[in-house]
């Protein structure tokens, strides 16, 4: 109603209008106040909107009518004004009620919203009643003004009554306060009395404790005195016992000397008889242990500083036994783990009980090993990994065909092996012994570095002292146990013992040892000479009788397994054969009963005896050999191994009627070895052998470590720390023997437990012998290449020599040398050629014996062979650290040979050393690249099994057999030589120095080699297809090749020559070859410059003092990279022969237009980010920029690999338009990522170097009230409200609203409310209403308590301030920059000045700890920040083709890993103030924005993957694949990626594909519908919220962000100029849920390549391009006829050939068949 109409109204009409408006208001108010939340929320929302609008409109009308009142109200003016104010208040109350109702609809279950709504509704009802009453009073007083006097009198009486009531209340409160004060004083007095009593009690207790301690000290002193007396007595007894033992040893030595004299006499007689009876000699195998003085010293018999041995014999024996126990336990564990793995991977359920036995043995050995460990955590970790291996092995046997369990088994075994390697390292560092592992084929050098061995050169043996000392310790121990036998022995018994071979019954074991032992022959002491007195004094008595005729060395296993051999006469072959068979049966029977474990040398000796018996029975004899010896094996290491064979002395045979001299028996099983009868050599041969004695006894070398690691992990995974390479030589032997000889020769290398079966290593007729390594005896001798043993043993058998003092002994020794070599050759020829299960399918030739790198664990995922991208083990042989390792090896060799160089090298600076290493590394890299390129160029030729090329990851310098460097390294790298100088060890351990440079060169070489696989195509199909076409078609194509110009001059000058006549045109085959080469060259240039650009950007971001030259260099390289990208795209179009009028060319045109704009935009600073980089947020922005730069560098590298794969797929299928579309999409993503990288680098450089924005900008204040001192602010109400916990009846009191000073005061005061929860909420949300600087200022103000306050209040307040600071530092240390930390330190000094030393110490220690953690993380991020190793998949398939072949479940796992990695990085401050929606605050939420951007990219990528497919069947296949991926994502509770897929499937270009939807299977549709119902957005994702979300969980982030948005918009930041802290409480609940998901969720899926690399970056077409593709795939029904004639399925230029009499389908099919045939050829 207008003003004129209102002015014409009378009083009655006016009041009637007011009454009508009031009725409408009451109706609408009832509607709003009585909202039923149980109904549908959508209808409630509509009803609320309508009623709220009507309510506000009617209230405004009422206010308008009151303001424009037409009647005269001069007598009651104040009533009119009062009526007007009441209506205004009512309007505000109604607005609050409407907001509360809206919040109630959104969250009806929240206690805060319901209570707030009820409160607002009550106030609205009260206000409407007051309004109606005011209106009625106004009407009454208008008609009767005299009533207002009565009202005034009533008002005066009411005011007086109120004043009296207030006075009474104040008096009552005052009395109550006094009572409370009295009670408090009484309580304080009681507390003081109690404290005094407690102090007295404590003093009494302390006195009692002191008396008890004094008594204990006295008792301990008495016990120590008694122990010292007992030890002195024990020492005296031991000294007496040692004297007695020495006397006994002297007696025994005298007896032995007498026996030697008798033996010498007998030998002289035997030599005379031997000349008469040479036809039938009987050779007695020698039994003495020959050593020389030089070998004793070089072999380590003399004690060293780092040796486990010591002059005290008892301690030495104990340490040797402990080392032996550890060695046996380690060997048993490795072999039994091999058996478990073999049985599990084979899937044989019948062998399941064997897993139990092997597991039992492993558990026993783990217990033994754990006793020797200093770090007990290693033992517990080993036990845990072992239990997991057994559990997974059982699952693998049950599920034979499931690849997943086999992969899990390999992962568990890898963890177990890694722990074993750490245990070996720890024990090695404690015991200082390196021989404890060599006897089992494991070398200490193989655990920490790569072996450098030249197979053509021999390495001089050098052993540590532990082995030789163990030999002598066991000799003395066995000698002391058999003293009685020696005292009773005589010459007759000595003679008879030679002819009676038997197994000794003295086979006993010590309780702490395992049954892998073979005690030494006691008679070895006969062969030592008196010259050994220079060794240790405690061992001199046992070495007085040892003779040293020649320099020979012997090595043994853990307890030096050697056997005493004896022979029988030729007249009794039957008896000897019976004894041999009986002994063999006894040994096998005991081995089956688990009583003993037969050493390998015993088995070999029994096998040799059986072979020789069969040869005697068949009448075969050796033509030249007159003596035999026990087969000698060697102890081996992974890098260097020495093979030592001792001299053999022969004794002429006795007459048949005489007895042979006897040898004393030992405590281990021994066997008799019959030898064939051979004639002796001539004197000339003896002289020649004498002259060549030194050459024939050069130390031999074999390498078993490589083969040992093979049979430990013979299927897939190498043991970490061991090399997996093997070596072999050509097989020159074809003779075979019977099964008995075969079973004996191929025995186990270490039969340490009954649960381990011996792996048999044999040779196959189609393969070479898999040998240990060459046994090089001499450089010019031809026998050194034939003397290579096909064995896998790591034990050592000793050829024992008997010494004679006559001149004939030397001749016999020389004869034995040649005979040993010939016998080894014969034994090699007798090994049967059976296939080997443990060896590789292709053996390498000796000329190509290379150090192949360890391969990653590979397995099949779907139909593509992939690999786990495991963390690289920190060893020098890592691919990334190749240059660094090689350079330091070179420097180490120089420093070891030239001490002066090492001294000067130590004095140099670290920068100088790094430059030297970098220069050497570049030289090695250049040579490596040259060799790798030459090898890759020749890789197309077929290689035979004997000719295997060098892997590209190996060093050509270290692998070259003819290289002098390789020879030098291998000759120096023996068992006693450490290739790393002590001065360089620190550098050697810091292996990540130049990993960034090598990572760049590595990926460049990978991409270059991959592009080199593009094969040149043969004759073009167009020569056949274009015979019937006109010349305009060729001219059109040549136009397109020349850049689209249609003039004839450019066509005639083109390199694509025209060949034709009579109007028929074509082009030469050379054109297609040139196109292929141009595509490869442009792609190679692009990738090289792209990777170089990434490296430059990353280096520039690390350097703080950035120069302008580097920036200009980056921009120039950026421009050149985009130019090469454009050239590569044009080359791919030319190679694919794309029609210029095709829609594909429009995509290329868009990218060409996009490149110049990006060139101008790249490398620009963001003004918003620069202005935000003030004192408050500078350190946060720089930290986020570092993370963003690293992420973008990785993205560019991944996109480069994807583009490489796409280019290769285009070369394989040029007709495939989908590959071209993928290339264009990847190129656009590459450009955008590269521009973002340049912008980030430029922003960091500018913010880091510009001093104007660092410290000069003042911190802005948020409110003027904050400047008031916290102690000077007037008292304001700070009420605490009750908030209930969700889903329970519990709750707590929290402050509703207050000023900043009052909120901080509530944090630091003593009250009954929940301070811990309040503190958590405050720390999570305080940056939404203040900043860290202001909070620090207020806390310092709170600490400065005024002097007027009581001392108790002062102390408690200061304590709570420091306690809150401690909590703040522990939880939110990222809030502190360097300047704020400086204020903290100043506050700490203030604490010291105030005598709060305890608080200062606590605060200072926490600050130091957090600063150390921050500096350590910065060092890791700068020095050790590396990019993950990327994998280029095999084959010539595009990423889309690979995606179709990959397994859906594995794709879901990798997507979950990628998305959860981003989600776990979200910080609480990123979820405040809606910073992700505001441009000025986006720098605060980098991870939230990254997750939003990835979800958007992922949705477009899903749509692109479907629309890139030309055939509708392929589109249906991709669609169903995404549905299956969504199903697996739902099972993993990955709702974020799940909804991203549904967003991509519900875009407009996809929803219009009706034909595609019609072909979906019913199963796929049911899954799609169920998941769509779950993720429906109706009711604010009601279905999604109702689902139980148990960890692991990846929630849908947009739901969380929408909840935060409603909380921010629906609740004001301040209420009556007070901070609304209840709003922060609501926000804290959401943030706490996010933190709970981050902490409780752990997706322990392995990173699998190439899936992970392909899914890291998701290039897609633009929305307009997608819609254009959608129209092409399924045109509109109205334009269907036109679309079929103009748009072809292949978009190839042959599709427009209908005018040239070429059919569309025929031409396209012919082209496709041609390319397929050319690829197959």
From Swiss-Prot:
Residues forming coiled coils: 148-279, 802-831
Residue ranges under compositional bias (Low complexity)? 454-469, 479-493, 501-515, 551-581, 628-651, 663-686, 724-748, 797-836, 933-952
Q: What happens when the gene is disrupted?
A: Absence of the phosphoprotein gefR.
> What spans are recorded as compositionally biased (Polar residues)?
618-627, 968-978
Boundaries of every N-terminal Ras-GEF domain copy: 1291-1411
Checking SMART domains in the record gives: RasGEF, RasGEFN
Per the UniProt record, one Pfam family is RasGEF
What keywords sit in the KW lines?
Answer: Coiled coil, Guanine-nucleotide releasing factor, Phosphoprotein
Q: How is it modified after translation?
A: Phosphorylated on threonine residues.
GO BP, sorted A to Z:
Ras protein signal transduction; response to differentiation-inducing factor 1
Q: Which PANTHER family match?
A: GUANINE NUCLEOTIDE EXCHANGE FACTOR, RAS GUANINE NUCLEOTIDE EXCHANGE FACTOR R
Q: What is this protein called?
A: Ras guanine nucleotide exchange factor R
Which species does the entry assign this protein to?
Dictyostelium discoideum
Q: Upper lineage ranks?
A: Eukaryota, Amoebozoa, Evosea, Eumycetozoa, Dictyostelia
């Amino acid at each position: 109603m207008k003003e004129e109409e209102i002015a014409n109204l009378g009083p009655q009409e006016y009041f009637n209008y007011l009454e009508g408006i009031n009725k409408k208001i009451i109706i609408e108010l009832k509607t709003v106040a009585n909202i039923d939340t149980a109904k549908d929320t959508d209808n409630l929302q509509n009803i609320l909107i309508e009623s709220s609008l009507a309510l506000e409109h009617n209230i405004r009308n009422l206010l308008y009518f009151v303001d424009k009142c037409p009647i005269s109200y001069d007598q009651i003016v104040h009533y009119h004004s009062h009526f007007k104010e009441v209506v205004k208040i009512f309007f505000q109350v109604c607005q609050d009620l409407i907001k509360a109702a809206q919040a109630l609809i959104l969250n009806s279950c929240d206690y805060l919203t319901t209570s707030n709504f009820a409160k607002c509704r009550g106030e609205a009802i009260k206000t409407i009643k007051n309004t109606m009453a005011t209106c009625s009073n106004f009407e009454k007083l208008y008609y009767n003004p005299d009533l207002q006097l009565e009202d005034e009198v009533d008002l005066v009486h009411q005011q007086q009554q109120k004043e009296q009531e207030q006075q009474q209340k104040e008096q009552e409160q005052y009395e109550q306060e006094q009572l409370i004060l009295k009670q408090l004083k009484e309580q304080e007095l009681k507390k003081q009395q109690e404290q005094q009593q407690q102090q007295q009690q404590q003093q009494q207790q302390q006195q009692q404790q002191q008396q008890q301690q004094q008594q204990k000290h006295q008792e301990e002193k008495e016990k120590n005195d008694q122990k010292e007396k007992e030890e002195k007595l024990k020492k005296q007894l031991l000294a007496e016992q040692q004297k007695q033992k020495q006397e006994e040893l002297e007696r025994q030595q005298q007896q032995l000397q007498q026996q030697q004299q008798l033996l010498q006499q007998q030998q002289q007689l035997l030599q005379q008889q031997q000349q008469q009876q040479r036809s039938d000699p009987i050779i007695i195998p020698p039994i003495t242990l020959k050593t020389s003085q030089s070998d004793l010293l070089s072999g380590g018999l003399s004690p060293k500083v780092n040796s486990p041995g010591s002059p005290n014999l008892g301690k030495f024996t104990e340490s040797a036994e402990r080392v032996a126990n550890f060695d046996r336990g380690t060997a048993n564990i490795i072999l039994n783990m091999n058996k478990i793995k073999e049985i599990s991977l084979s899937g044989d359920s019948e062998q399941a009980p064997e897993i139990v036995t092997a597991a039992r043995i492993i558990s026993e050995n783990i217990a033994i090993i754990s006793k020797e460990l200093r770090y007990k955590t290693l033992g517990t970790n080993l036990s845990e990994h072992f239990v997991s291996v057994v559990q997974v092995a059982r699952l693998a046997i049950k599920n034979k065909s499931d690849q997943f369990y086999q992969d899990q088994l390999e992962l568990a075994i890898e963890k177990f092996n890694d722990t074993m390697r750490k245990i070996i390292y720890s024990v090695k560092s404690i015991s200082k012994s390196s021989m404890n592992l060599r006897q089992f084929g494991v070398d200490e050098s193989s655990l920490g570095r790569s072996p450098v061995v030249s197979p053509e050169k021999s390495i001089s043996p050098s052993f540590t002292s532990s082995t030789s000392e163990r030999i002598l310790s066991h000799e003395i121990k066995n000698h002391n146990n058999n003293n009685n036998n020696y005292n009773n022995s005589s010459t007759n018994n000595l003679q008879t013992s030679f002819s009676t071979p038997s197994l000794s019954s003295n086979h006993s074991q010590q309780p702490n040892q395992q049954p892998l032992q073979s005690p030494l022959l006691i008679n070895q002491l006969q062969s030592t000479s008196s010259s050994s007195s220079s060794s240790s004094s405690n061992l001199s008595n046992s070495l007085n009788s040892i003779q040293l005729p020649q320099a020979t060395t012997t090595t043994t296993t853990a307890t030096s397994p050697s056997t005493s051999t004896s022979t029988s006469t030729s007249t009794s072959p039957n008896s000897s054969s019976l004894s041999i068979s009986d002994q063999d049966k006894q040994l096998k029977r005991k081995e089956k009963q688990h009583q003993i474990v037969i050493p390998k040398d015993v088995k070999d000796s029994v096998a040799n005896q059986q072979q020789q018996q069969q040869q005697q029975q068949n009448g075969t004899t050796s033509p030249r050999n007159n003596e035999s010896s026990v087969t000698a094996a060697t102890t081996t290491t992974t890098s260097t191994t020495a093979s030592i064979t001792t001299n053999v002395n022969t004794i002429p045979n006795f007459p048949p009627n005489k007895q042979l001299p006897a040898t004393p028996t030992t405590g281990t099983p021994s066997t008799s070895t019959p030898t064939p009868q051979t004639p002796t050599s001539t004197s000339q041969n003896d002289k020649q052998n004498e002259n060549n004695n030194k050459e024939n006894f050069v130390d031999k070398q074999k390498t078993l470590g490589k083969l040992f690691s093979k049979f430990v992990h013979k299927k897939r995974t190498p043991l970490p720390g061991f090399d997996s390479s093997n070596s072999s030589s050509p097989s020159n032997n074809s003779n075979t023997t019977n099964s008995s000889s075969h079973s004996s020769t191929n025995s186990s290398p270490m039969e340490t437990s009954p649960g381990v079966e011996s792996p048999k290593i044999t040779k196959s007729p189609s393969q070479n012998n898999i040998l240990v390594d060459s046994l090089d005896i001499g450089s010019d001798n031809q026998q050194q290449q034939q003397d290579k043993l096909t064995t896998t043993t790591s034990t050592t058998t000793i050829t024992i020599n008997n010494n004679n003092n006559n001149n004939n002994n030397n001749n016999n020794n020389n004869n034995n040398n040649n005979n040993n070599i010939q016998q080894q050759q014969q034994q090699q020829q007798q090994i049967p050629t059976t296939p080997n299960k443990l060896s590789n399918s292709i053996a390498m030739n000796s000329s190509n014996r290379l150090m192949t790198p360890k391969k990653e664990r590979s397995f099949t995922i779907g139909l593509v062979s992939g690999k786990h991208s495991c963390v690289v083990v920190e060893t020098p042989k890592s691919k990334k650290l190749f240059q660094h390792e090689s350079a330091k090896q070179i420097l180490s060799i120089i420093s070891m040979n030239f001490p002066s160089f090492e001294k000067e090298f130590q004095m140099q600076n670290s920068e100088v050393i790094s430059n030297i290493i970098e220069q050497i590394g570049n030289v090695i890299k250049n040579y490596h690249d040259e060799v790798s390129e030459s090898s890759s160029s020749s890789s197309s030729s077929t290689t035979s099994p004997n000719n295997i090329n060098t892997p590209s990851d190996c060093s050509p310098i270290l692998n070259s057999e003819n290289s002098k460097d390789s020879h030098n390294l291998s000759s120096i790298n023996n068992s006693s030589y450490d290739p790393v100088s002590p001065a360089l060890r620190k550098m050697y351990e810091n292996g990540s120095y130049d990993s960034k440079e090598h990572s760049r060169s590595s990926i460049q070489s990978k991409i270059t080699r991959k592009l080199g696989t593009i094969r040149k195509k043969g004759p073009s199909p167009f020569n056949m297809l274009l015979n019937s076409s006109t010349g305009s078609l060729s001219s059109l194509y040549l136009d397109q090749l020349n850049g689209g110009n249609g003039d004839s001059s450019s066509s005639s000058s083109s390199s694509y020559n025209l060949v034709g006549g009579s109007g028929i045109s074509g082009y030469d085959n050379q054109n297609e070859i040139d196109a292929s080469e141009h595509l490869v060259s442009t792609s190679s240039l692009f990738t090289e410059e792209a990777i170089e650009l990434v490296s430059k950007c990353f280096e520039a971001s690390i350097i703080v003092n950035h120069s302008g030259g580097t920036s200009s260099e980056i921009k120039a390289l950026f421009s050149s990279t985009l130019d090469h990208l454009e050239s590569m795209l044009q080359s791919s179009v030319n190679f694919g022969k794309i029609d210029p009028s095709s829609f594909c060319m429009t995509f290329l045109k868009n990218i060409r237009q996009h490149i110049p704009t990006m060139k101008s935009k790249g490398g620009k600073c963001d003004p918003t980010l620069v202005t935000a980089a003030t004192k408050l947020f500078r350190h946060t922005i720089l930290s986020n920029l570092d993370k963003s730069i690293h992420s973008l560098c990785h993205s560019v590298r991944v996109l480069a690999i994807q583009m490489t794969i796409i280019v290769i797929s285009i070369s394989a299928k040029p007709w495939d338009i989908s590959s071209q579309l993928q290339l264009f999409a990847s190129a656009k993503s590459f450009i955008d990522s590269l521009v973002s990288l340049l912008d980030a680098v430029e922003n960091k450089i500018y913010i880091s170097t510009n001093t104007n924005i660092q410290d000069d900008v003042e911190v802005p204040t948020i409110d003027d009230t904050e400047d008031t001192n916290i102690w000077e602010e007037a008292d304001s109400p700070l009420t605490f409200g009750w908030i209930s916990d969700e889903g329970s009846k519990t709750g707590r009191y929290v402050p509703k609203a207050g000023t900043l000073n009052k909120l901080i005061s509530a944090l630091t005061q003593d009250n009954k409310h929940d301070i811990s929860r309040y503190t958590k909420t405050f720390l999570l949300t305080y940056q939404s209403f203040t900043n860290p600087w202001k909070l620090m200022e207020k806390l310092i103000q709170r600490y400065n308590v005024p002097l007027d306050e009581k001392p108790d209040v002062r102390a408690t307040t200061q304590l709570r301030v420091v306690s809150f600071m401690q909590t703040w530092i522990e939880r939110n240390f990222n809030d502190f920059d360097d300047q704020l930390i400086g204020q903290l330190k100043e506050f700490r000094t203030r604490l010291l000045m105030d005598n709060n030393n305890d608080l200062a110490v606590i605060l200072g220690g926490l600050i130091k700890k957090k600063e150390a953690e921050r500096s350590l993380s910065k060092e890791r991020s700068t020095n050790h920040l590396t990019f993950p190793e990327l994998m280029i998949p095999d084959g010539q398939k595009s990423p889309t083709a690979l995606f179709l072949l990959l397994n859906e479940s594995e794709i879901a796992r990798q997507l979950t890993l990628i998305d959860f990695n981003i989600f776990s990085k979200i910080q609480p401050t990123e979820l405040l103030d809606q910073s992700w929606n505001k441009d000025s605050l986006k720098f605060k939420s980098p991870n939230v924005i990254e997750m939003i951007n990835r979800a958007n990219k992922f949705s477009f990528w899903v749509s692109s993957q479907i629309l890139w497919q030309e055939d509708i069947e392929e589109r249906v296949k991709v669609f169903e694949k995404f549905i299956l991926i969504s199903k697996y994502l739902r099972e993993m509770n990955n709702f974020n990626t799940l909804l991203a897929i549904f967003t991509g499937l519900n875009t407009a270009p996809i929803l219009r594909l009706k034909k595609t939807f019609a072909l979906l299977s019913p199963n796929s549709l049911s899954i799609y519908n169920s998941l769509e119902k779950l993720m429906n957005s109706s009711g604010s994702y009601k279905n999604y919220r109702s689902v139980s979300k148990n960890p692991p969980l990846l929630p849908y982030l947009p739901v969380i962000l929408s909840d935060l948005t409603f909380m921010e918009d629906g609740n004001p930041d301040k209420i009556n100029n007070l901070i609304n802290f209840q709003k922060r409480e609501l926000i804290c609940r959401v943030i706490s849920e996010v933190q709970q998901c981050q902490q409780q969720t752990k997706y322990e899926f392995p990173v699998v390549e190439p899936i992970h690399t392909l899914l890291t970056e998701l290039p897609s077409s633009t929305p307009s391009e997608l819609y254009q593709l959608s129209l092409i795939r399924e045109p509109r029904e109205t334009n269907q006829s036109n679309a079929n004639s103009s748009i072809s399925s292949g978009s190839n230029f042959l599709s427009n050939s209908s005018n040239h009499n070429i059919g569309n389908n025929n031409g396209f099919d012919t082209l496709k068949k041609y390319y397929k045939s050319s690829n197959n050829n």
